[in-house]
UniProtKB/Swiss-Prot annotation:
Cross-referenced Pfam families: Ribosomal_L31
GO biological process, one term: translation
Transmembrane segments: none
Gene3D superfamilies the UniProt entry points to: Ribosomal protein L31 (4.10.830.30)
Keyword DNA-binding tagged: no
Protein's name in the database: Large ribosomal subunit protein bL31B
Amino acid sequence: MKPGIHPEYRPVLFHDTSADVYFLIGSTAETDKTHTHTDGKTYPYVTLDVSSASHPVYTGEQRKTKSEGRVAGFNKRFAGFVGGKGA
């Protein structure tokens, strides 16, 4: 490999702010911020909005959306037609 053209690979502390979870991962991410981790060492610090700790696909939690409300309204309106009064 040519010297001086590759980014520095080092441990970086990522913080998922929505779940308040920290991940210490090897990365080449550039940042000017630093933060002291629970091990007492100071690492480069990057904040995240979403990670595997907070994303609904990984947590199993579903967030209610407008379309889910419309489906629930449809099911409520037509619930009597399926195996209901006329059968």
